[in-house]
């Protein structure tokens, strides 16, 4: 299954929330990303069907491939954030971009 940028964003967000909170629910993801619960439910379903996520007792878990992709996206995000900060962009803005 082809993973689009939005799917990558969801996987990265799940990874970040797991690192921060340990366990992640759909409602946590909705709050973090600023999306509606139905939008998150749809995306979770697509990612689950693609083999990137599993859901167990209401908690989201990255599969091996989902985690690999999320880690790559997160590393890329950190690299570009650092480049923006070095270029003089405020850290808060660099994190958002």
Q: Which residues does each PLM region occupy?
A:
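Basic, amphipathic "hinge/linker" alpha-helix immediately C-terminal to the N-terminal HTH DNA-binding motif
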Residues: 58-76
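A short, conserved structural fragment
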Residues: 48-58
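Conserved functional loop/turn residues at catalytic and ligand-binding sites
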Residues: 14, 51, 88
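Basic amphipathic alpha-helical segments that dock to polyanions
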Residues: 10, 29, 40-48
């Amino acid at each position: 299954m082809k993973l689009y940028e939005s799917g990558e964003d969801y996987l990265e967000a799940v990874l970040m929330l797991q690192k921060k909170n340990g366990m992640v629910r759909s409602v946590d993801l909705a709050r973090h990303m600023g999306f509606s619960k139905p939008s998150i439910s749809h995306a979770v379903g697509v990612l689950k069907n693609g083999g990137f996520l599993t859901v167990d007792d209401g908690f989201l878990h990255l599969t091996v491939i989902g985690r690999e992709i999320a880690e790559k996206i997160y590393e890329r995000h950190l690299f570009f954030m650092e480049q923006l900060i070095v270029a003089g962009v405020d850290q808060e803005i660099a994190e958002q971009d």
